[in-house]
Amino acid sequence: MLDIQLLRKDLDGVAKRLADRGYPLDVAAFSALEAERRAIQTRTEELQARRNSLSKQIGAMKGRGEDTSAVMAEVGGIGDEMKASAVKLDEIQARLSELMLEMPNVPHESVPVGRDETENVEVRRWGAPRQFDFDVKDHVDVGTPLGLDFETGAKLSGARFTVLRGPIARLHRALAQFMLDTHTQQHGYSETYTPYIVNPDVLYGTGQLPKFAEDMFRVEKGGAENTVTQYLISTSEISLTNTVRDSIVEASALPIKLTAHSPCFRSEAGSYGRDTRGMIRQHQFDKVEMVQIVAPEASYAALDEMVGHAEAILQKLELPYRVVALCTGDMGFSAAKTFDLEVWLPAQNTYREISSCSNTESFQARRMQARFRNAQGKPELVHTLNGSGLAVGRTLVAVLENYQNADGSVTVPVALRPYMGGVERIDAPSSAA
C-alpha cells in the first residue's frame, strides 16, 4: 500500500508515475474523498472545542447555582452530531482504504518506462548457448520417455498438471535440494517451512488480494453455516514475508533472509492458450523462494545481491541466461523494481523467465505493519524483497533441453550429481542397461 501522506502531498506526481505502469489513478475520486474527510475532521474539531468550552461553562454556572439545562441540551446535540460525523468519517476512511488497496506500487526512478515485456531492457548475458550437431527436441519429447507423464496428470487433475516418475522425479527433487543447500550454505538464508494454505489477510499483506483473487485457488472448510475461505499459496513469498506481519523487530536482527521450497498453485487466469504444451505454465509447480526483510537504506543493495544469488544457481548448473530489467508496464503489482532472469531454451530458440527478483520497498510492509526499531528507537517500516531461486519445474525443463543427447539420454549437470547418487546420465529406456 502506498503512503497516504505521499498521495496527499503529490497526488498528480503519483498519478503520473502510476500511469507509466498502466494504472489510471482516479485523481478526482481520491481528491473528493480527501476533501470530504478534511471537512468532517475540521467540523469535528470545531464541535470538540465548542463542547469543551460549554463543559467549562456548565461547571461555572453550577458553581453560581444557575440553570444549565439549555447549555446541557446544546452539549447533547453536539454529542449526537459528533457521533454521526464519526460514522461518516469511518465510511470515508473505508472507501479511501478500498481505493488505495487497488493502487500498485510506484516504480523506482531507475525503472525503464515501457508498456509491456517488449520494452524490457537486457542488462547482461552469461554463457553461450550450446551448438547441437543433431535436431534438438523440446522438453516434452526429451522427458516423456524418461518419466514425464502429462496424460496421467491430466487424468488426475485436468490440463496443466504433470506426473513425474523415476529418474525425472529424482532429478526434480535433486534440483530443489541443490537450490536450498546453495542458498542456506553459501548465501546466508535460513530454510523455512510454512503452510501452503493461508488466510485472506495474509494475501492482502503481500498484495495478491483484493486485485488478483481470480489467480488464486480457494479452499473452504466447515459446514454451510460456518464456511471459512482460505487460499492455496501461489508462491511461498506470501507465507515467508508475512512471518513479520504485525511485528516490530530490532534493527540488529536485520537483514532477515528466508528461503523455502514449496509447491505453488496458480489458476493462470488470463493465460488461456499460452504455453499449453509441457511444463512451462502449470497450475501446480515447485519453486525455491528467497525473501529478505531489510532496513530501507539497504534494500537496493539487497536486490542486487538477490539477483546474484539466483544467477549463482544457473551458473553452477552451467545454463546460459540473461538478466532483464522490467519496464514499468511489465512489473508485478507490489514491485518498485524487478529484474527477471531468463534461461536459454534451445528448442524454443529463445530465453524464458526462470526467476523474478523484486524490491517492494515499504509497499508490502505498510499493508502488513511490519516494522523495525530504528536508531532513534522509533518503529519504522521495513523493506521487503522476494525472488525465485529458482522455479524448479522450469529449471528441469532447461536441464532436459540443454543437456539432451542424440541417443535420447540426458547428461546430469555436474552440480547435481552428488544429489543423484553419482549418476552422470539419465538414459532413455532403449539404451538403459
Curated annotation (Swiss-Prot):
Similarity section: Belongs to the class-II aminoacyl-tRNA synthetase family. Type-1 seryl-tRNA synthetase subfamily.
Gene3D superfamilies: Bira Bifunctional Protein, Domain 2, Serine-tRNA synthetase, tRNA binding domain
UniProt binding sites for ATP: 266-268, 353-356
Gene Ontology biological process terms in this record: selenocysteine biosynthetic process; seryl-tRNA aminoacylation
Top-level taxonomy: Bacteria, Pseudomonadati, Pseudomonadota, Betaproteobacteria, Burkholderiales
One Pfam entry name: tRNA-synt_2b
Binding site for L-serine: 235-237, 289, 388
Role summary: Catalyzes the attachment of serine to tRNA(Ser). Is also able to aminoacylate tRNA(Sec) with serine, to form the misacylated tRNA L-seryl-tRNA(Sec), which will be further converted into selenocysteinyl-tRNA(Sec).
Stated name of the protein: Serine--tRNA ligase
